[in-house]
């Protein structure tokens, strides 16, 4: 059985959406017969987490839950990406939004074994730096997609955003088009 460690475990944020994402990541790994040895919480410096580093040494690879972290040359984002300088093991960026980053970021991202983004804007940003990526839905919707596909009747729903103005716009679109509006919480 292959094993990995997870960097940027957002379930420690105590936010419903973050909990769903990490739960879905764990479910996905299990489905692929990959053992999750350890996680490093969001905001905690993985380089100083001795327990995490011990498990990293045992693991076959590293998964980074990038979520909305890799943008605007964020110091925290850069610290996550630096894992490719620390280990020679395969590293995977998943669930990523990527925007407004400098060349120092793209140099690190280009060294990842696989990069999975959650929208085409990020894919286009990476293509500018000749970095291949695959667009997949946000991990929030992993289980929802399966449930939706198993239904006989296909319905459309609109959800909200962390941005209040965008949430209002989404709500108005739903109302105007008689579409069910489902806030994430």
Q: Which role fits each region the language model picked out?
A:
Residues 1-185:
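Active-site anion-handling motifs in enzyme catalytic cores
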């Amino acid at each position: 059985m292959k094993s990995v460690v997870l960097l940027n475990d957002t379930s420690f944020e105590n936010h419903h959406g973050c909990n769903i994402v990490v739960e879905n990541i764990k479910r996905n790994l299990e489905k692929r017969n990959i053992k999750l040895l350890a996680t490093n919480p969001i905001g905690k410096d993985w380089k100083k987490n001795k327990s995490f580093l011990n498990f990293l040494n045992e693991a076959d690879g590293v998964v980074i839950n990038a979520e909305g972290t890799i943008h605007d040359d964020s110091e925290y984002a850069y610290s996550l990406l630096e894992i490719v300088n620390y280990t020679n093991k395969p590293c995977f960026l998943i669930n990523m939004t990527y925007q407004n980053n400098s060349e120092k970021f793209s140099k690190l991202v280009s060294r990842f074994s696989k990069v999975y983004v959650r929208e085409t804007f990020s894919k286009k940003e990476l293509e500018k730096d000749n970095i291949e990526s695959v667009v997949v839905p946000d991990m929030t919707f992993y289980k929802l997609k399966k449930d939706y596909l198993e239904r006989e009747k296909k319905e459309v729903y609109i959800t909200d955003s962390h941005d209040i103005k965008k949430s209002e716009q989404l709500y108005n679109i739903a109302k105007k088009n008689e579409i069910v509006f489902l806030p994430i919480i």
